[in-house]
């Protein structure tokens, strides 16, 4: 619930705006027109394009998802990206108050701005974005899914994740890693992986008896004439954060030494670029970049951080792509002599009103939701105030 102080500040600001002869916020912002071409505009660079999506949480359709108003960093993480919010975040990334990106990336004036800019995400819009990038960049594109994909919606609960599995089959990622997927249980996860059509990579998931890998730890892909080694890092604390009985025979952990060995093995096989597809969370990934040499790019998931610029840690590029289908990350790389000579990045906001739905994905979503339409349309209650995720606590 909004505090008395927050209400007073908001009410005072709104009154001042009108008293000064200004227009209501929604009318002031209506002039910022969003187009699909503008959202997809990008100055291409180099020979590799990494496209990253993560933490869909089975959200097939557009959502109103407010970014947190509090994001507490502990110790050395305090006050550093991504542990800044609101006005501080907007100052750090030079975002104008009330702009489309301010709405997408921060929490202030969320309800009012939502009336202007609308919902975000939707797998049919995400599909349009990804198809456009693939059409532009061809065989340079590597699409990677950071996990938390198959579960957490009503339709995914009813279908044991099959609605999202089928949606991702249309999206055609080259690889994925996992976290909440494991709450489907070992047998169901194995069943899905066997028919997935692309690898689930997780170097840090081992069977309890022999400590052997349950899934492939890594895979080499050729893109744009570059050999790319992709390592999967599933959420390391799954048995703690989720019920242990769901994955009784598997162990997790960060497995830093094993990760270093995986990097060395990939380099030995000729990999010119090492990408960690991670569900560790941003702070753990930043620490890994400091501690484990040889990682060129970390695509970070789990903590839902949407960061509009690359975070550079030594020689590692760290990318955080948000959640719930609100964003697609595009990272163009100029790879030469087994190193990154240059890069260009954009966190693409998926404004549902501005992006044309992909017809194939749209048809799948409608078919997947149709058997549950009565449940999905049921009104459970009405709130007096906005409900939202408070933050990371």
Regions inferred by a protein language model and the residue ranges of each:
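Acidic, metal/ion-coordinating pockets
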Residues: 2-356, 360
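Hard-cation-handling environments
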Residues: 356-393
């Amino acid at each position: 619930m909004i505090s008395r102080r927050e209400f007073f500040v908001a009410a005072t600001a709104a009154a001042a705006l009108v008293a000064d002869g200004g227009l209501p916020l929604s009318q002031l912002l209506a002039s910022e027109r969003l187009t699909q071409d503008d959202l997809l505009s990008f100055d291409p660079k180099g020979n590799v394009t990494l496209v990253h999506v993560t933490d869909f949480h089975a959200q097939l359709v557009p959502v109103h998802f407010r970014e947190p108003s509090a994001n507490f960093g502990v110790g050395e993480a305090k006050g550093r990206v991504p542990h800044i919010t609101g006005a501080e975040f907007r100052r750090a990334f030079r975002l104008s108050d009330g702009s489309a990106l301010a709405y997408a990336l921060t929490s202030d004036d969320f309800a009012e701005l939502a009336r202007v800019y609308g919902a975000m995400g939707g797998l049919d819009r995400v599909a349009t974005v990804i198809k456009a990038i693939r059409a532009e960049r061809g065989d340079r594109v590597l699409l990677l899914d950071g996990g938390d994909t198959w579960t957490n919606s009503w339709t995914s609960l009813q279908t044991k994740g099959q609605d999202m599995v089928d949606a991702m089959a249309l999206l055609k990622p080259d690889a994925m890693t996992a976290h909440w997927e494991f709450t489907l249980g070992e047998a169901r996860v194995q069943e899905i992986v066997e028919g997935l059509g692309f690898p689930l990579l997780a170097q840090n998931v081992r069977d309890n008896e022999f400590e052997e890998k349950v899934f492939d730890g890594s895979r080499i892909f050729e893109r744009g004439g570059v050999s790319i080694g992709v390592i999967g890092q599933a959420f390391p604390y799954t048995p703690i954060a989720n019920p242990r009985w769901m994955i009784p025979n598997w162990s997790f952990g960060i497995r830093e030494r094993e990760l270093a060995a995986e990097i060395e093995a990939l380099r030995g096989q000729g990999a010119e670029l090492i990408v960690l597809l991670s569900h560790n969370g941003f702070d753990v990934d930043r620490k890994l970049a400091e501690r484990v040499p040889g990682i060129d790019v970390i695509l970070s998931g789990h903590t839902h951080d949407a960061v509009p610029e690359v975070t550079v840690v030594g020689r590692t590029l760290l990318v955080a792509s948000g959640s719930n289908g609100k964003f697609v990350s595009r990272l163009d790389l100029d790879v030469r002599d087994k190193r990154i000579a240059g890069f260009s990045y954009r966190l693409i906001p998926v404004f549902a009103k501005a992006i044309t739905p992909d017809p194939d994905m749209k048809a799948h979503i409608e078919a997947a939701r149709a058997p549950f339409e009565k449940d999905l349309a049921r009104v459970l209650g009405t709130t007096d105030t906005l409900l939202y995720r408070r933050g990371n606590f």
